[in-house]
Amino acid sequence: MKFTHLFFIGLLTKVYTETVTVLSTRSYRLATTESTPTDGTVYLTLTRQQSSSTSLNASTITTPPSNSSASVQTTAVTDCHFHNSVQYCVDGYGNEGSILPVPTNTNNLPTSYDGCHSHDGDTFCMDGDKEVQFVKLEDEDDEESSSSSGKKCHFHAGVEHCVDDNNHDAVTCERVKRDYDIPLRIGLLFVILVTSGIGSFGPIVLKQFVNLSQENYIIVIIKQFGTGIIISTAFVHLMTHAQLMWSNSCLKIKYEGTGASITMAGIFIAFIIEYIALRIVNARDTGKVDKKEIEETSSNEQSLHGISVNDKISVMILEAGIIFHSILIGITLVVTDDVYFITLFIVIVFHQFFEGLALSSRIISITNASLSTKLVMALMFALITPIGMAIGIGVLNKFNGNDPSTLIALGTLDSFSAGVLLWTGLIEMWSHDWLHGHLRNSSFVKTTVALVSLILGMLLMSLLGNWA
């Protein structure tokens, strides 16, 4: 019996002291040992080695003690390199992962990050005074996640909106530090300027040189397409963005009708300005012409709701609503994360061109304004979005889209602009042309062309709402 015990003791001793060979096709790190002075536990640290087999002595392999307060056992990630513009690094356990946010300028980037620590199960490291996130490859749930693993993020009006895997809001109200490609933004500012100018000046120049009548098919197509653009902008872009602002979890407003109330105020203010202008015009005309002449002129030139759509005041109200939200477009485009910037920029280019076309289609209809006045109105639209972009570049390193004051400012302007555009789009443009204008008794062909143009404007602008 004693001999048997000695035999098993010897066998166990032999097994525990033998060298164990691990075969793998992956790159492992050379095993080194480090002992702690407190409990004598031996830890295994790996260093990279290109080899198909690595020998590890079983006596040096022990499992480190679990620590519920931290999931990161090292304080640095090293061997950082690039694959397809994404920076990958390796942590102390040989796990490869990517660095978020994705850097836009790949020059002079560090090959390692230190000061690594854990927040809610996620690993963060320091790049100077900036914090970056290290996400292990097996933990990445979505390639489009810009904030952290398990989050799906996108930008609406410059504000990042994130949801987790259960479609619950995953919003941080603190400012997120990002690297912005400022030279790119400055260069594309001029592209927006040119595109907006083409849209706003194009119809004016066309009518000036070709001298088309208001009932010409080209003018009808431009005007009805523009009407569809304005209607879609109000409903799909402004009201949707405003609702996202007012429903943001960082904004503690209990009244759910805030955005709709401000939109209603925008409609009322647009109406009251136009009504007062009408009363002033009527009072001025009463002293000059017979009341009968006023009524005859009104039946031919004015719509039943009180003021001619061709009047300068009406178009100025329309332009005011467009300008309010165009300056926001410039600001929010610039502060968008680089991952989404180019996509949003392309959408905004089309957005500004279509909206400039819509505004200009009404500017050319003004009968009581000179050419210079029309050109100034077109120039104001062309400049306003680049001005917004310049403001955005100036506040780039301070902007926090989830700050309550920012949300209130953006939400108020979006809601108010929606109200103004709803009044001008529905009353001054759509209703006037179709119920009280020349399209009321137009031919079947012209009616069909106008209707298709109207629907096309709505569809295209609504489609852009998927990205902007």
From Swiss-Prot:
- Recorded GO CC terms: plasma membrane
Q: Which residues form the signal peptide?
A: 1-17
The residues on the Extracellular side of the membrane are: 18-185, 239-257, 336-338, 396-406
User: TM segments?
Assistant: 186-206, 218-238, 258-278, 315-335, 339-359, 375-395, 407-427, 448-468
Predominant cellular place of this UniProt entry's protein: membrane
Its Gene Ontology biological processes? zinc ion transmembrane transport; zinc ion transport
Q: Which residues lie on this side of the membrane: Cytoplasmic?
A: 207-217, 279-314, 360-374, 428-447
List the carbohydrate attachment sites. N57, N67
Q: Explain the induction of this protein.
A: Expression is RIM101-dependent and up-regulated in alkaline conditions. The promoter contains 2 RIM101 binding sites 5'-GCCAAG-3'. Expression is induced by macrophages during oralpharyngeal candidasis infection. Expression is also increased during hyphal transition, biofilm formation and surface adherence.
The domain of life for this entry's organism is: Eukaryota
> What happens without the gene?
Leads to poor growth in the absence of exogenous zinc and impairs assimilation of zinc from host cells.
Q: What does the record give as the reaction this protein catalyses? A: Zn(2+)(in) = Zn(2+)(out)
Q: What UniProt keywords apply to this chain's record, in alphabetical order? A: Cell membrane, Glycoprotein, Ion transport, Membrane, Signal, Transmembrane, Transmembrane helix, Transport, Zinc, Zinc transport
A Pfam match is Zip
Molecular-function GO terms, alphabetical: zinc ion binding; zinc ion transmembrane transporter activity
Query: Where is this protein found?
Result: Cell membrane
* Membrane topology of this protein: Multi-pass membrane protein
Family the entry assigns: Belongs to the ZIP transporter (TC 2.A.5) family.
User: Function of this protein?
Assistant: Zinc transporter that acts with PRA1 in sequestration of zinc from host tissues during infection. The pH-regulated antigen 1 (PRA1) binds zinc from its environment and then reassociates with ZRT1 to acquire this essential metal.
Matching PANTHER family: PROTEIN ZNTC-RELATED, ZINC/IRON TRANSPORTER
UniProt-recorded name of the protein: Zinc-regulated transporter 1
Q: Which organism is it from?
A: Candida albicans (strain SC5314 / ATCC MYA-2876)
